[in-house]
């Protein structure tokens, strides 16, 4: 089934009569991407039951690529297409694209921006990115982690279009306490 639960929905006008009677074209990450997996898990409730998918029952299928610029080019050349990729790439290409608000778990329509991502209101399409560290090497990476959790680290994160955790957030504090606990126990 498509994401509206109806296998026969293929036109924008079938979702809303004010939309054109043109094929719904979808573009995004390829199936090897974490973005693809995350988006599918977040948006398709029946995905694991063999229900909703990206391309099932679509005449034009699903245009996918490991290269975000391929998706942007597809969206630019297909005005009735919709696509998805990470916020960082949207920020880099926002002069060519429009980001659509989504209805979050509170029922509000929220557009993606640094504030709504940081405060968690842009859900279910917000996810954390992790730094994984082997505890045996914590002494060697501690200074890097101090930098990553500093204001300078936040500047780097912002400069590439990602949204840093706020130093006052409980998630940031909890994460830093875990780093300190490992250092103190090593």
Question: What positions do the PLM features span?
Answer:
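Flexible loop/hinge segments at secondary-structure junctions
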Residues: 1-186
